[in-house]
């Protein structure tokens, strides 16, 4: 049986048909609807995330792959430049640089052929996640604020290097940025336990030539240091030209400059992208813990009515990759009243961060898409984002089905039939995303489908069907398969 027929019969769901209603649907008979289901229009069919590995692409091969996908029943592609897998054979192909003339020429090849054979194109912003580039100025790069805390003996002289603090706090990111630069924001001694902010002693003036030297009072104390790292992380799996520092998503001017640079470069050769694309796409908002921007303290004061800086050493936890908390019990023990105050400040901090991301990144992206006449698609959730509100303005809000329907992590760790975690249909992401679509009357709820199957090149269609059904249960109406290359 032809692969296309299998895909059409197994993977095209009633949910997808309902999500993309025909203009004349009210006049269609049940017989006509059945015919549409037998041979769906391309917009009802699943799309694929189409990886351009290392941007090592050639015109003839791109055309061949489009036809291969078309014949398999795929309706569209998400063009997704990504880093080349380490250690794999390059097959003597030349890497193209993102936004170079040669790279844009390859876009034209795809746009022309996709249009000719009736396929749809989406285009990712940048490459990898979260997006950025080697060309970003230092002011345009993401920043992170981290807290250092360690007990110090009372009644003795503390003599230590700032370098040791910087080394301990060195951000645990997915891809280290060699340009990362630490800056000391504050330095405190705090009693352990601490019951009031006024008990902390500012010792910032006790640093000379990178050495902290201070007489610690009698008793139990903790040394706190707040450190800001500029250029702290690189794009995860970025292709050449878009693989440098992560963009500061809390800087509206930097975001708009990045977006305009991308479209200005492409449209200078190809004309309006609205003639070629259905949607722009923003991948995972895994900002590696980014939590700061140059005017954050000023914005916090304006919005919350008090100065956040004295509180920050006590509100932050010890963190690791992606900003995941490594240690909640960090630094001095806190009295009940002080702990309650710190929790309230922490909430205000996270609220301010989410507001800035919503206003400066998300709304900037939406406005830019509308100006370009291209639909917006994004995975607008993750640490620091409003899980519901961020999806409300998108034309195509997107969720994800992240794993196989029955594995925890690898073969030999199968989940039993009674395990509610089978298929990840229980997770909140898709439910928030689909709820946002329902609230806005939007019927297309996109999904990065089956992100990790753990069985590369051996996954059965049955396996994909069961896994994608779980996504459909959580409100998904359109699959973008992860992936094809």
Region roles according to the model:
Residues 45-58, 89-105, 238-261, 283, ...:
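The substrate-binding groove and active-site-proximal loops of carbohydrate-active enzymes
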Residues 132-133, 372-485:
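Hydrophobic targeting/anchoring helices
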Residues 1-6:
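Positively charged n-region of N-terminal signal peptides that target proteins for export
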Residues 28-40, 45-47, 54-64, 68-76, ...:
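Mature extracytoplasmic enzyme cores
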Residues 18-26:
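Boundary at the C-terminal end of the N-terminal hydrophobic targeting segment
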Residues 64, 68, 102-112, 116, ...:
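Alpha-helical scaffolding segments of alpha/beta enzyme cores, especially the outer helices
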Residues 75-78, 118-122, 220-223, 274-283, ...:
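Beta-sheet entry/capping signal
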Residues 8-18:
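Bacterial N-terminal signal peptides
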């Amino acid at each position: 049986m032809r692969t296309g027929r299998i895909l059409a019969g197994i993977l095209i769901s009633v949910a997808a048909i309902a999500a993309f209603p025909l203009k004349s649907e009210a006049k269609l008979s049940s017989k006509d609807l059945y015919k549409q289901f037998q041979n769906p229009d391309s917009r009802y069919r699943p799309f694929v995330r189409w990886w351009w590995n290392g941007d090592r692409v050639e015109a003839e091969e791109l055309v061949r792959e489009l036809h291969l996908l078309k014949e398999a029943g795929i309706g569209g592609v998400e063009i997704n430049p990504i880093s080349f897998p380490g250690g794999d054979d390059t097959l003597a192909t030349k890497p193209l640089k993102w936004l170079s003339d040669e790279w844009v020429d390859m876009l034209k090849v795809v746009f022309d052929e996709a249009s000719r054979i009736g396929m749809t194109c989406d285009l990712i912003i940048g490459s990898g996640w979260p997006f950025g580039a080697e060309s970003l100025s230092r002011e345009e790069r993401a920043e992170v604020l981290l807290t250092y805390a360690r007990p110090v003996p009372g009644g003795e002289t503390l003599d230590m290097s700032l370098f040791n603090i910087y080394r301990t706090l060195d951000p645990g990111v997915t891809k280290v940025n060699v340009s990362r630069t630490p800056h000391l924001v504050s330095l405190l001694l705090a009693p352990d336990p601490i019951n009031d902010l006024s008990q902390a002693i500012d010792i910032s003036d006790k640093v000379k030539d990178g050495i902290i030297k201070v007489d610690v009072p009698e008793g139990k104390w903790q040394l706190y240091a707040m450190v800001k790292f500029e250029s702290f992380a690189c794009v995860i799996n970025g292709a050449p030209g878009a693989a440098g520092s992560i963009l500061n998503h809390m800087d509206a001017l930097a975001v708009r400059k990045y977006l305009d640079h991308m479209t200005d470069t492409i449209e200078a050769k190809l004309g309006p992208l609205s003639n070629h694309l259905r949607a722009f796409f923003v991948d995972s908002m895994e900002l590696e813990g980014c939590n700061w921007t140059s005017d954050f303290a000023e914005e916090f004061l304006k919005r919350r009515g008090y100065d956040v800086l004295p509180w920050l050493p006590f509100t932050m936890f010890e963190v690791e990759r992606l900003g995941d908390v490594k240690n909640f019990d960090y630094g001095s023990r806190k009295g009940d009243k002080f702990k309650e105050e710190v929790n309230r400040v922490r909430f205000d901090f996270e609220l301010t961060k989410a507001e800035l991301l919503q206003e400066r990144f998300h709304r900037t992206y939406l406005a830019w898409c509308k100006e370009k006449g291209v639909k917006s698609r994004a995975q607008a959730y993750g640490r620091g984002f409003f899980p519901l509100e961020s999806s409300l303005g998108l034309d195509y809000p997107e969720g994800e089905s992240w794993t196989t329907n029955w594995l925890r992590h690898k073969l030999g760790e199968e989940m039993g039939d009674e395990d509610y975690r089978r298929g990840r249909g229980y997770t909140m992401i898709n439910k928030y995303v689909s709820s946002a679509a329902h609230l806005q009357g939007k019927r297309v709820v996109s999904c990065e489908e089956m992100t990790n199957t753990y069985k590369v090149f051996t996954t059965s269609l049955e396996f994909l069907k069961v896994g994608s059904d779980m996504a459909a249960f959580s409100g998904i109406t359109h699959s973008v398969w992860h992936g094809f290359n």
